[in-house]
Amino acid sequence: MKNTCKSVAAFALLASAWPLWAQTAPAETAPAAEPAAKDAKNKDEVVHLSPFLVNAGDSSVGRYSSLESTSGGRVRVNIMDSSQSVSVITSDVLNDVAAGRILDATKYIAGISESTLGSNAQDRTNVRGFQADGHTVDGFTYGGFINLDPAIVDRIEVVKGPNAILAPQPTSPGGTVNNATKKPMFKNFGAVSVQVGQFDANSASLDINQGIDDHMAARVVASFRDWDNWWQGAGIRQTTIMPGFTYKFSDQAQVTLQYIYTDWKSTLYLGLPADPSAGTNNTARIIAGVPRDLSVYNENDIYRIDQQHDWKLLFTAELWKGIQMRLSALYHKTSQYAPQLNTSVHTDGNRDPLTGDFVPGMQFLQVPPYTGSPIGPAGRTFTRSGTDPRNDPRQTMIQNDYAYLFENDSVKSTTLVGFAFTETTDYGNMAHNINAPAFDIDHYVDVPWTMGTLNFDNRLSNQFKQAYVSETLSLLKNRLILNGAISQNYYRQRARYLVTGVFHGNAPDATLPAYGVVIKPYKDVLSLYYSYSEQSTANQPSNSAANTVPPLTSSKQNEFGARAKLWDDKLYFTVSYFDIVQDNFSVPNPANLTTPPPNPLLPPLFSDRTAKGWEYELRANPTKHLSIIGSYTAFKNRDPNDVEFRGTAEKSGAVLASYKFDADTPALDGFRVAIGVDYIGDRPGDAASGLTAASTPTNPIPNQPSFYLPSRTLTNLIIAYDSKKHWTVQLNVDNVFDEEYMMASINRSMIYVGTPTNFRGTFTYKF
């Protein structure tokens, strides 16, 4: 991961282009006010912001808070008026934590935590306990191996729970994490940033914005990474370039064009085995006797590569007085390859049929009286095998919305009508079996894998169509807000499996309602809300002759909560209770991780699940110097047998507090100090399913997870100095107290080991 020459050369080339440029505005956000050098008459003009855009500069409760969002209902709404839980991460949070991945910032939002993969791919997170893969960028959701580079992100809007009118439907019923990209603004500015550090650092970024004239603005953001992970020989190399152009036809109409290029390569590190002593009811630890940073994955032949191209269009206009329109489109093209070797799980224990608990060092009769007896150690040699999947998807997405805004002395109405279309094809979805020799974990030596037989070769296509209508009424001087929506969704799935000679297709549809109410007893200080919403996603048919995969996965949520904005708007607090029911939930089939893997790979498993619990969030700016964001979540996310899901921590919390010195303390003027603390509770380390042999119809005994990742609390320190002469230096110390922890896991043989204390330094020059 030391190949930096190309990145440095490209960075220098972009930097040298500065004199040719002249600036833009935040993602799905409005361009900033035009240059002050306009004539005096313009000072009296009113700039009308499209209801489909949000002002990225909004921070009415301090640096860490914005109370406007467009992600929940297609149009801009004050969060105090929303009947669904919505949270915003501002650019100040992203900058203060020097975010290397999106989760570095979103972990301060209630309900969001680490999932089953570590920090080196896919931005996989848990939202209200539901695993969410891939990315939502400017309202469009797509997959990939990459971690989205926060350098191109202006703000993050999180909508909790199912949402009937989002398109395409969210991949997780827990919610949607929408990353709003940086967009052209009508002013001139630029910034160059360089970061160096021990691990997960060594990067450079460039952001140049130019207001060309009253009608045109341009912006280019570029970022280059050459990271070394803490694990031996592992790293990430990434290039992201995002040019954008905005043309303003008038104050009521503008179009923005963007292109995002991403080139990604990361070591496919999957972790180390658990110690054989790990069981359901004790504290798990990494296998003893080996370095915690040991990697048994050779970066030269066990890796993920992903090259993505995104072409985007956003057009907003006022068609007639009170009638607004938004047209947004994306063409997404990606090529992916990821040879993956899975380490076999040792038989170092078994589940007790009478309890379902995994007991290390024991075996049990599967017939009465289900007695146990010791087994010998499984040894320290591990077999492994896997596949080398390739994907070549192409996606076309279109969203078209129309809003009619009406207001008089007694009522304010927002009527929305919208349409959406998504088409995805992947005619390069294939993989071979790959094999590598067994390895002794005490004397590991890299040995290249060899390719075996073809595992699968698929031709996949799917289509999504949506039409929706939504109405929001504000009554009694905005004291009572009612909203309702209905969405009609049509799906078409086609899958041809060349290895098995099977073709399946289905065309389900769904009618999804949503409604809510907001009551504001006292002005804009207290907001009480309730909402109900549904969503659905289509499932890919199975590769077997009998298609047993349900065509749709559906989710329903009831949510209620309260928001308070106090202390002259310096304090914002929210508490919410949610109850989500999901049917036909898809989870990876653990049998695909066996050695050798099934040929072809088995379809996912499906289960129903419920999630219910409480979330608490705080934003505060008690003084002009102090900014705070914090959250705590306590919930249950279980299957029908009341068994927890792999990687889901049912308790989590985080707080970030920043203090900025100014001229009131001359000796420290310009310094900023922040402390971030995040906690994740115990969570299952592997997926458990089914019942034990001792179960009866009246006494079912579910299998329990074989081990749990222990809870952990990490503390991060930030010290920064903002010069009066355009430059900033910042030191981030991650995991200050050097806590040893398990970051995530796939099963007993693949546990991501957490990074120890890590120092990262960032220098930024603004012009």
Question: Language-model segments: what does each one mean?
Answer:
Residues 152-154, 165-241, 249-253, 571:
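Outer-membrane beta-barrel translocator/receptor signature
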Residues 246-250, 393, 410-424, 456-582, ...:
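Structural signature of Gram-negative outer-membrane beta-barrels, strongest in the C-terminal barrel
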Residues 311-334, 382-497:
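Face-selective signature of the C-terminal outer-membrane beta-barrel domain
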Residues 318, 324-330, 334-342, 528, ...:
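Membrane-embedded beta-barrel scaffold of Gram-negative outer-membrane proteins
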Residues 476-479, 604-688, 762:
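Gram-negative outer-membrane beta-barrel transporters
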Residues 678-688, 694, 720-767:
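C-terminal beta-signal and adjacent terminal beta-strands/loops
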